[in-house]
Regions:
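Hydrophobic alpha-helical connector segments
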Residues: 44-73, 93, 116-119
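Amphipathic alpha-helical segments used for helix-helix packing
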Residues: 68-86, 128-136
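Amphipathic alpha-helical packing segments from all-alpha helical-bundle domains
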Residues: 84-118, 142-154
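Amphipathic C-terminal alpha-helical segment
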Residues: 121-138, 154-162
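An amphipathic alpha-helix adjacent to DNA-recognition modules
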Residues: 11, 20-44, 57, 61, ...
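Append "Primarily bacterial transcriptional regulators
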Residues: 5-8, 17
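Short alpha-helical functional segments enriched in proximate histidine and acidic residues
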Residues: 38, 42, 66, 102, ...
């Protein structure tokens, strides 16, 4: 990706990009921040759902759908090939805020980060394998994803009951 290619794609001259961004690294960071915020913005409708399990299911479905609609943008978030491709701390915090609120409904507040990491690790691992075509044993992949999310929600509910 070059500044010239981006300028051409958005219909401006490359020098005008440099007025807004401090080079290619800043451009990539801005894209990563935008992707993180877009993914995090999906929590808003889920937060309106009363049942936390349903809310997490809705969020997990959006997460997976986003990865399928925008695999390049999705992979950018989790790549360590370019340090500048990591979203800023502010964008990461904004992206995670809704998920943390949802997990706090199921577990003690001090465990919500661990619960959010568990959900993210499962969803990311599953989606990454799915995008790579790694599920080769047959069966319904949609059903498998739902089963995994449901199992995690049930485990979190049990853990949360120990408050």
């Amino acid at each position: 990706m070059t500044m010239q290619a981006v300028a051409d794609a958005v219909g401006v001259r490359a020098p005008s990009l440099y007025k807004r961004l401090d080079g290619r690294s800043a451009l990539i960071r801005a894209i990563a921040d935008d992707v993180a915020r877009e993914l995090g913005g999906a929590t808003a409708p889920a937060l309106e759902l009363e049942d936390p399990g349903e809310a997490i299911r809705a969020l997990a479905g959006h997460y997976r759908g986003f990865a399928h609609r925008s695999p390049g943008a999705y992979q950018l978030l989790f790549s360590n090939l370019l340090p500048e491709a990591s979203p800023s701390a502010e964008a990461n915090a904004a992206a995670a805020a809704g998920l943390l609120q949802l997990t706090e409904r199921l577990v003690r507040r001090e465990r919500s980060l661990q619960a959010a990491r568990l959900l993210t690790a499962f969803a990311h691992g599953f989606v990454s394998m799915e995008l790579a075509g790694a599920f080769r044993l047959g069966g319904d992949v949609d059903e498998a994803y739902g089963f995994g999310i449901d199992a995690i929600i049930e485990g979190l509910r049990i853990s949360g009951a120990e408050r």
